[in-house]
Amino acid sequence: MTKTTTTDFDTLRDGDTIDGPTFAVSRESIRLFCDASLDYNPLHLDDDYMKGDFGRTNFGGIIMHGMNNFGLITRMLTDWAYPAGAIQRRLETRWLKPVKPGDTIEPIGVVKSKQSTQKSRWVLIDVLVRNQNGEQVATGEAMVEFPVPGSIAA
């Protein structure tokens, strides 16, 4: 795999990687996401609740919102694609492992394939999020649309 900073559709190759920003997860960052999303589920806020009857999930304490992973992936794709006039059109993710306060996570994209049509150019990207131990905590697939040279969007 080759790390890419290019957003030139023609020079992108299958296997090129896109690195995203690292994110240090804290109780405060989890609380701020609760406030932003209006999701005050005790999964994200209440250690006692997580250790009680619900504790059979074995999380052992509060966990970060899965949508926070989604947002980090979206930020990575937007930071990479937007300068070229490209737009994230689709993102599907699956949460694999809970993320807890004290974890540091980082999204990564891997170019899977490219396709050109008369009206647009498409890049399919495998995405994943890893924690500080190299464990995958989320995985998925994204589609980014690049404008055709000479089009109004280009």
Model-derived features with residue positions:
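Hot-dog-fold acyl-thioester-processing enzymes
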Residues: T2-I87, P149-A154
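A generic structural signal for short beta-strands and their flanking turns/coil linkers
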Residues: P21, S29, I87-L91, I105, ...
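Conserved hydrophobic positions within beta-strands
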Residues: T22, W95, G109-V111
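Short C-terminal domain-edge/linker segments immediately following a structured domain
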Residues: M50-G55, T93, A138-V144
